[in-house]
Regions:
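N-terminal periplasmic "start-of-domain" segments of outer-membrane beta-barrel proteins
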Residues: 37-67, 97
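Hydrophobic, lipid-facing positions within transmembrane beta-strands of outer-membrane proteins
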Residues: 39, 96, 157-159, 176-178, ...
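Extracytoplasmic beta-strand/coil segments of soluble accessory domains associated
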Residues: 75-116
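Outer-envelope beta-barrel architecture signal
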Residues: 108, 174-178, 183, 190, ...
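A beta-strand signature from Gram-negative outer-membrane beta-barrel systems
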Residues: 132-179
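Transmembrane beta-barrel strands of outer-membrane/channel proteins
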Residues: 180-184, 208-214, 264-270
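Surface-exposed beta-strand-turn/loop segments characteristic
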Residues: 207-244
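Flexible loop and strand-edge segments within Gram-negative outer membrane beta-barrel domains
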Residues: 219, 235-247, 253-306
Length: 308
C-alpha cells in the first residue's frame, strides 16, 4: 500500500511539472515595433519679468499687488520699493522724482513700455503724473536689467523704473472690454476714468483709456504766532494747491503669431497745478502755477528669430 501511494505521488509531481510549461508559453509579448502617437498640446503664456531669475537686484509690483497698495499714482507705489528715495517738492501737484542709491533723479531713467521718457523742461521726470489705472506691472531695477533689447540710455543709468501698461486680453467668445472707475477723497478729490478695449480681428486689437482728476488741495494746518507753548495759534488752510490733470492714451496692437507682435501707442497729458510756498511772517499768499502739456507716439515691434 505504501508503494502505491509513493508511486502516485511521483506521478502527480511529474504531471504538475510538465503541465505548467505551456502556461508560460501562453503569455502575450509587448509589441515594441509599433509607434504610438500622442496628441500635440500647445501651452502659451505672456513673458513677464520675474524676480527669482534676475541677475541684478529687481523689485516689481504686479497689477494685483498695486491694487492692494491702495495707491493713486505711480509715485505713491514707488515709495514701497526698498532703497528708493522719492523727492516731493511740496503740494499735491508738486514735482515728484525718484532716485536710487542717492545718486539723484538724473541717474534713474523712467521707461514707459520699454521707451525712455525725457523732459526738456526740468531735466527730471515727474512720476506723479502717471496713474496706476492703466499699469500692468511696475518694476525697479537696481543696476543693469537682464533685458538686452532696450535703449542705450537704459544701460547708461544707475537704475531703471519701468512702467508696463495693460495689454488687451479677451475671454473666449468676448470681443469688447469696458471698465470705468470713479474715485473721490478728501480736499475735493474727484477722479473718474474709463478703459475701452475692442478686438477688431484675431490679429488686431485697439484700446483707449482716459482719466481726469481735480482737487482743491486746501488741507488745514496750524499756524503758531511764536515759539512759546502759550502763544496764540490759528487754523489755516493751504492756498494755491489746486490740481487739475487730464490723460488720454490710445493703442493699436498687432498679434500676428506667438513669435511676432507689434504695438503703436499715442499718449497725451496736460495739467494745471498750483505750487504753494511756506508761510513766512504769517504771509501765506502764493500765486505760482505750473502748466504742462506732454504728448508722444511710440511704436514697438518684437519678432522672435529662430534657427540661428
Amino acid at each position: 500500500m505504501r508503494y502505491v501511494t509513493f508511486y502516485m505521488s511521483i506521478c502527480a509531481a511529474f504531471c504538475c511539472q510538465f503541465l505548467s510549461i505551456p502556461l508560460f508559453a501562453q503569455q502575450q509579448k509587448v509589441d515594441t515595433t509599433h509607434t504610438y502617437f500622442i496628441p500635440e498640446v500647445t501651452v502659451s503664456d505672456i513673458y513677464q519679468t520675474r524676480e527669482v531669475r534676475s541677475t541684478a537686484p529687481l523689485q516689481l509690483f504686479s497689477k494685483e499687488a498695486l491694487k492692494n497698495l491702495h495707491a493713486l499714482q505711480v509715485s505713491d507705489a514707488v515709495k514701497h520699493f526698498a532703497g528708493v528715495t522719492v523727492k516731493d517738492y511740496g503740494g499735491i501737484g508738486g514735482l515728484k522724482t525718484v532716485s536710487i542709491r542717492s545718486l539723484g533723479a538724473q541717474h534713474t531713467v523712467v521707461g514707459y513700455d520699454g521707451i525712455a521718457i525725457t523732459d526738456c523742461q526740468t531735466g527730471q521726470i515727474d512720476i506723479g503724473r502717471f496713474s496706476l489705472d492703466n499699469v500692468d506691472q511696475l518694476s525697479l531695477s537696481n543696476g543693469q536689467s537682464d533685458n538686452i533689447f532696450q535703449p542705450a540710455r537704459f544701460f547708461a543709468s544707475a537704475g531703471i523704473l519701468d512702467i508696463q501698461t495693460l495689454t488687451p486680453r479677451f475671454e473666449k467668445g468676448k470681443r469688447t472690454n469696458i471698465s470705468a472707475a470713479f474715485k473721490t477723497g478728501s480736499w475735493g478729490l474727484v477722479n473718474p476714468s474709463i478703459l475701452l478695449e475692442q478686438q477688431l480681428s484675431p490679429q488686431w486689437t485697439v484700446s483707449a483709456n482716459g482719466e481726469w482728476m481735480s482737487s482743491d488741495g486746501q488741507y488745514p494746518y496750524t499756524l503758531r504766532y511764536g515759539n512759546a507753548a502759550d502763544d496764540l495759534t490759528s487754523r489755516e488752510k493751504r492756498k494755491n494747491t489746486d490740481v487739475e490733470t487730464f490723460r488720454a492714451e490710445a493703442g493699436l496692437y498687432g498679434n500676428f503669431s506667438n513669435k511676432e507682435q507689434w504695438r503703436l501707442k499715442a499718449y497725451y497729458f496736460q495739467s494745471s497745478r498750483g505750487l504753494p510756498k511756506a508761510t513766512t511772517l504769517y504771509n501765506d499768499f502764493s500765486a505760482q502755477h505750473l502748466w504742462d502739456k506732454n504728448a508722444f507716439i511710440q511704436s514697438q515691434y518684437k519678432p522672435q528669430i529662430r534657427n540661428l
